[in-house]
């Protein structure tokens, strides 16, 4: 599920590991034995008017498709008034920022700037996610 929400600054590729934050609203709830097992929530904080953020849109769609029912992809446009609260909630300093949450909603990785799909693949595979084709 890719949520389009909708402007900021950009610095190429800064990564930060393990920031202890939990967002209960984004924790995947497996309420039945047949529900898909979501392992990761990928939160993209950016804007539809930010050029590097726009470049992340196809990456997010591809990741969502490749990892299907193992990942939830969420996009917040922090330049829209109703979504600015997420910039504060996640403590972002620039956009785009990608925040990755484990199945319990705990942040395990954060990246600032454009994040290439190949690097996201490596991160997700370290977390045990498999592509639809199994690799």
Where are the predicted features?
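Thiol-based oxidoreductase modules, predominantly thioredoxin-like and allied folds used
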Residues: 45, 69-83
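N-terminal targeting signals for export/organelle localization
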Residues: 1-25, 135
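The canonical Cys-X-X-Cys-His
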Residues: 50-53, 98
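Non-catalytic, surface beta->alpha helical segment in thiol-disulfide oxidoreductase systems
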Residues: 94, 99-135
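A short beta-strand-turn-helix
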Residues: 18-40, 84
């Amino acid at each position: 599920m890719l949520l389009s929400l909708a402007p900021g600054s950009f610095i190429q590729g800064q990564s930060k590991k393990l920031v202890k934050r939990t967002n209960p609203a984004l924790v995947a709830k497996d309420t039945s034995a047949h529900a898909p097992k979501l392992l990761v929530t990928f939160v993209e904080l950016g804007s539809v008017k930010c050029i590097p953020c726009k470049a992340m849109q196809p990456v997010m769609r591809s990741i969502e498709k490749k990892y299907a029912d193992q990942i939830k992809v969420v996009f917040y446009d922090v330049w829209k008034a109703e979504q600015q609260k997420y910039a504060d909630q996640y403590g972002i300093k620039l956009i785009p920022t990608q925040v990755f949450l484990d199945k319990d909603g705990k942040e395990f990785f954060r990246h600032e700037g454009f994040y290439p799909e190949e690097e996201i693949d490596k991160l997700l595979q370290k977390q045990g996610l498999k592509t639809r084709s199994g690799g």
